[in-house]
């Protein structure tokens, strides 16, 4: 019984807003970008968007007032940290000198480390086939084509 309670506490501990925030801020610190703060307002927006996707869990961006990363995990448990790690793992695909993504696949990472986005709100919901749908929104919006996410002198 004690093992079950410990595992339940561990699962719960890996599914808090702080998990989203800590991993975002770690990725930002690696390139000398200041930390983000959790925003309940932005988190409410993320939750409302998830509710719209509840029926299909389609990987479609909200086109709302914030920057956005979305993903889904197909595990019995897909923790908040897992989603953020997927995005952070795109870092090697970003060439800061040329401001290019290898294969065009680093936009989640650049959204995470964008210097002007300072507020974060995220949400997660279960979907079909044991998947989890995760959305994080960034305020103010960013990730503009042709602009670098952070200054070159910081790397």
Task: Locate the predicted segments by residue.
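Short, well-ordered surface patches within globular domains
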Residues: 12-67
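Disulfide-stabilized extracellular recognition modules
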Residues: 66, 74-155
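Cleavable N-terminal signal peptides of Sec/SRP-targeted secreted and luminal proteins
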Residues: 1-13
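Conserved, non-catalytic sequence blocks in retroelement Pol enzymes and Pol-derived host proteins
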Residues: 11-15, 37, 73-77, 112
């Amino acid at each position: 019984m004690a093992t079950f309670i410990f595992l339940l506490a561990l699962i719960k501990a890996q599914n808090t807003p702080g998990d989203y925030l800590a991993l975002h801020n770690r990725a930002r610190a690696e390139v000398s970008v200041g930390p983000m703060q959790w925003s309940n307002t932005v988190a409410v927006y993320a939750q409302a968007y998830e509710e719209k996707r509840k029926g299909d869990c389609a990987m479609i961006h909200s086109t709302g007032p914030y920057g956005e990363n979305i993903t889904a995990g197909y595990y019995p448990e897909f923790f908040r940290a897992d989603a953020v790690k997927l995005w952070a793992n795109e870092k090697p695909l970003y060439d800061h000198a040329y401001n290019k993504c290898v294969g065009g696949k680093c936009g989640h990472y650049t959204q995470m480390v964008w210097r002007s986005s300072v507020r974060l709100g995220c949400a997660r919901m279960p979907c079909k086939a044991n998947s989890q749908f995760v959305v994080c929104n960034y305020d103010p919006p960013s990730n503009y084509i042709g602009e670098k996410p952070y200054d070159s002198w910081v790397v």
